[in-house]
Amino acid sequence: MKILIDNGHGIDTPGKRSPDGILREYRYNREIAAALVHQLRERGYDADLLVPEDEDIPLTVRARRVNRMCETLGKDNVLLVSIHCNAAPPDDGGWHNARGWSAYTTEGFTESDVFADFLYAAAEEVFTKEKGLSVRKFRNAKYEKDWEAQFYILRKTLCPAVLTENFFQDNKADVKYMLSAAGRQDIVSVHLTGIENYLKNRKR
């Protein structure tokens, strides 16, 4: 199984930062993605960064990289996670109240939703109310916790794929947690546990 970790955006993407500029999403995504790949490799998994560059590689190119791997190994032998930080409307450069962790798949039920369930299970164990944290679930869905959206990186790739929104870069409490050593490791650990448990339980 090839595990591809995508780090959203790039150094040249406008905006995408906390209002005080301390957190820049492209950098944070890359730090989390690199730590996750490192820990996956330490556990013996075949994991790679999808975008080693600092620049914002176009989504068409990102999807092509994933699908090339799917064509080589088979789409059932590739797994994709796209790492992002969330932001609340309006895009006014200010702090907002929305908080929490969430994950997205495409519309309808696919293997990506099965994968997302394992990520949510891991998130609910770590991002607890006792820590002052929250996990955002799609409450209108009867069987699924993840949100659904037609994000290009999910819609145009052939393998199971989930996009995670790792808290809000425009919420002061979330940013404080995200930038803490404990917060960083928690976010990496949730992805690591979710990936491992999915791979251990997936139907062959």
What is the meaning of each model-derived region?
Residues 1, 43-48, 73-80, 158-162:
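Loop/turn elements at helix/coil->beta-strand transitions in domains of secreted/extracellular proteins
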Residues 1-65, 89, 97-99, 128:
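Active-site histidine-acidic residue metal-binding/catalytic motifs
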Residues 3-6, 17, 23, 82, ...:
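Active-site-adjacent mobile loop/cap segments within catalytic or ligand-binding domains
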Residues 23-31, 56-60, 109-114, 178-189:
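Soluble non-cytosolic domains of exported or imported proteins
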Residues 33, 37, 60-63, 100, ...:
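Extracytoplasmic/secreted envelope proteins and their assembly/folding machinery
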Residues 34-45, 67-71, 120-128, 183, ...:
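Sec-exported extracytoplasmic/periplasmic mature domains
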Residues 59-76, 151-156:
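Mature extracellular/periplasmic domains of secretome proteins
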Residues 112-145:
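Active-site-adjacent substrate-binding region
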